[in-house]
Amino acid sequence: MNGATATATAAVGAEEEGGAREGSRRRDSVESAGDGRRRTKVSRACDQCRRKKIKCEYQEDAQSCSGCRKNSERCAFERVPLKRGPSKGYTRGEGAGDGARETEGARGELDTSRADGKAAPVSLPPLHYYLPISNGQPGGAPAQAPAAPFPPMKQQFWKVPYYENQMQRRSSLESVNSDASGPQSQQETYAASSASTSSHQRTSRSYFPSSDGASALFQEPCSSSYPPPLVRSSSTGGQLQQLPAPQYPYSQFAVALSGSTSASSQSVQLRTSATGSTSLPEDSSPSSSNAYSPQLRAHCMSESLTTPTAGSKTGGSVKRRKRLSEPADPIVPLSAREPRQAGHIGLPLQAQQATGKTGVICGKLSDAELIDAYYEYVHVNYPIIPINKETLTNEILLVNTQPISEVHEMNNYILYWFRVALELLLHVASDKTNQDTASGMDSNAVHDGGLYAHRGDFKQNEEHHVPHQSQLLAALNDCFRKLLDIHPKICAYQESTSPKVTTIYLSTYIIINYMLAMLGEDNTFVLGTSVTVFNEFKIYRLLVLHEVADEPGDDSADVERHGFELLYKRLYYSLLVFDALQSCCFGAPRLASLPISHLVEPLFAPPPPLDSAKWAVESDAARREPLLASIRLGALLTELCETRVLAGALPRAPTPALRAPRPFRVAPPADDSVPGAFFHALAAQRALLDRLLAIPAHPAFAADAPPDATVDLCAQLGDAICRFTSCVLDTLVRAGPRPASPFAAALSRALHHAINLSRNIPTSLIGCIIGTAVHHSRDRDLIVALSRCMSDMIQIQGLTHCLRPCAPPRPRARVSCDLRRLYGHDGPPASPHQVMLHQFIDIAWRLLRNDELGWF
């Protein structure tokens, strides 16, 4: 339709030019005739009388009419005859005048002048010109208000220059679109500096694409991959001179670039003055313009992305984000941001506003700061992304997302939602209250208590924007749904998908499971889907055959392949850990039951040649040991599931003990770390449970047991309960009110329930020891230790109620003893001390049920 309009406009223009030239020739002929060729009849009025619309009384002798003589004007009849329609038999080819031929000649000269530029690589305008936008409405919709000069531009993660060989993909549909680009006078002339935007874009600090409408690309598989017709505006050509300079310091493409000051200022003006109404529906392609700054793109809560209308301007101005090399604070205060639509998560910088204490605002950290914050405060607690920062930023994240094919558009989609999940992870992993006093660090530094607390005014604003847990869960669910939407595409292009993209895609699932574990939520559905996705990639085969796999050779390609397989196995290891954590929390059977206790060192401290810095899980050796402690704690959870009583056949006859005490296969980490403290607390709880379950086999359980046997049993139980209480208190003190470990929420609740169930044991043991006739010095020491144990339990009660982000666990009013009714074989008590021992046995069965059927 645009092509037909352009053709008709050109034809009318040619006809008007031809008519004007014909009239000029007629006037020249009339002037040349002079006074010798005057009109001979008064069939028409003169020009002056026709203009004044009066009667023309022409007199032959005076050669003038009465009106002209009266006004002393020249009586002339020089009107050009009106052009009439074509005569019969008229054809367009025969009727083409000199004007049309001259127009074609002018066009030929213009094409000839551009012949030299066709042989060189062509730099097309930014992709956001491909979508016709009129006042925030799609092309064809009536405009309700004057449109902005052009839709605001988003910075692409990667730019690939367009060369002539890409024109081989043109089809008949594309040819029609290219012919409908509008008249030549309305097309924009781009400066030469815009041709280098591809090289400028490669060095950008942004590692993540910003396709707010990327999801619908994969909802319309039949859509054409060719760009729609160009819609350009000549009034905005000067603002597209140069993209921002590189900002990420780790990339191998981060080379210093020198740009003109005027182009840089125009780029800033472009990002900060976009106040027109622009609506980007979700069914738009990521190849279209990224209309917002790259630091803020999380579109998680809504199906469309809408910026404020032209009339909704705010007083605050959007500040430009500065580079990390500059001393100024790169964080933009919320007070300097424009309004944000309610109900949206992670709207762009120009569309943000404070939404109360329940809003989730993504994009407060740039891409570089986001990765830095993850490796500084999250990665040391558990390697969700199982690779060091240098390899991630310099290799894995360097993915081509230019929409030249469906595979590249898929890369763009995956990388975008990976960034969204990573920033939501920092929302979950950061505490925004009571952190300045807990940390002795400077208020201008980023620390574990406030990842975004760079300035005092920002912290003050941040207190009003603490996201509610329900909104965090809604954002996680939406991110998870977007991953499921793309999964069929990934399966279809699995052979042609880069291992980098596969690593990013699988890491996003691990991030979501990590966040749900941090929040203490039931993630059965998410975990089951994640296991299904991992199994479709056949990663379990790599893990099962790890010990018999071939060693990588000297070839770099072979080492690269084994390196990415190592990353896949690390990710599957983490998935098995979260599966075991889910099973321990809710008592559900494990979805994947592969043993991993023996794989801690081979996977995370591999032998050569995979022990190089490139494939190391952490490049800093000092931080590697705490990280391995968290990994060993995850392996302990899997072993707790494997050694369950209900996992095997339970005895139907009386037995001395349901489970023989034995040490764990996992090597215990150091005691001075938070994972190590949790590890030893769980081991102490298991030892106490085994000791209580073994009471029926002890000689003191007999009705006529001697006092010495009773005191000996009390000493064994006292040592077990004191050690368990001491480990739990040490764990909670080390973890603090905000445990950074993903297992902290679940393990703290498990230990809290265990303390509640066993809190009467010290008092009963003290009474039993005092009631016996035999008193020794060790008895007095045991009483002192049990008294200290009672004091520790009081402190534990207070510490467990200060845990965040999970709510403090409520004590269970009644824990049923179903297992004791099924498998207990002890008879009724026959003596007073047996009454106490039966109470201990009842506590043991309750503890066993808590371990076997779920901590929550």
Swiss-Prot record:
Stretches of Low complexity bias are at 1-13, 184-207, 261-270, 277-294
Region entry Disordered: which residue ranges?
A: 1-42, 83-121, 168-244, 261-330
> Which Pfam families did the record assign?
Zn_clus
The residue stretches assigned to a coiled coil in this entry are: none
Q: Which domain of life is it from?
A: Eukaryota
The UniProt entry, under InterPro entries, shows: Carb_Metab_Trans_Reg, Zn2-C6_fun-type_DNA-bd_sf, Zn2Cys6_DnaBD
* Key words, A-Z: Activator, Cytoplasm, DNA-binding, Metal-binding, Nucleus, Repressor, Transcription, Transcription regulation, Zinc
- For this protein, the DNA-binding region equals 46-75
Kindly provide the name given to this protein in its UniProt entry.
Answer: Glucose transport transcription regulator RGT1
What is the species of this protein?
Eremothecium gossypii (strain ATCC 10895 / CBS 109.51 / FGSC 9923 / NRRL Y-1056) (Yeast)
Q: What phylogenetic lineage does the species belong to? A: Eukaryota, Fungi, Dikarya, Ascomycota, Saccharomycotina
